[in-house]
Amino acid sequence: RVQATFFLLGENMEGRRKMVEELVKDGHLIGNHSYHHVQLNKLSIKEAMGEIEKTNRLIREWTGEAPVYIRPPYGAWSQELEKVVDMIPVFWNVDSLDWKLQNKEQVLSCLSGQVEEGDVILMHDGYQSSVDAAFALVDHLQKQGFVFVNVEEMVLE
């Protein structure tokens, strides 16, 4: 069994409460990915906070816990947001390009030989090819001795 962190888009959560509850029940960590997948650093602070807070409310209401971590869409973050957002921004150092390739074999090829201990791999759940690639990647990396943890466990280490 693998632990992961799912950074959820508020607009994609709508109508999927059971799925979110299942993720939590399965021991995964839930983080915020904004409401509309916009570049937060291009918005006013008030608009950016609205994007974050709207998704935080949904997560808190559905899981009983306020999210601690946020993955800003496109990795777009600013010093101003850092000052006003009381959350820990999480970035990645390995991009699977799954959003662009939309092909399981190409995603696996892209990641082949790239992943090292301590890496944060960026993947998306919006494409079946990404989901299929994630399962195949987990199997492949576990056979190599990799252990999967959620973001919180990485931060605490």
Question: PLM ranges: what are they?
Answer:
Residues 1-54, 58-61, 65-66, 138-140, ...:
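Active-site beta->alpha N-cap acidic-glycine motif
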Residues 38-65, 76-117, 130-133:
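Alpha-helical scaffold elements lining the catalytic groove of polysaccharide deacetylases
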Residues 70, 80, 152-157:
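A short, charged, Gly/Pro-tolerant segment at domain boundaries
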Residues 15, 20, 30, 77-79, ...:
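A broad, structure-centric signal for solvent-exposed, well-ordered loop/edge residues
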Residues 11-22, 68-75, 95-102:
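Phosphate-binding glycine-rich loops and adjacent basic patches that engage nucleotide phosphates
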Residues 8-10, 32-34, 71-74, 93, ...:
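A cross-domain feature marking catalytic cores of carbohydrate-active enzymes
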Residues 116-152:
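Catalytic grooves of carbohydrate-active enzymes
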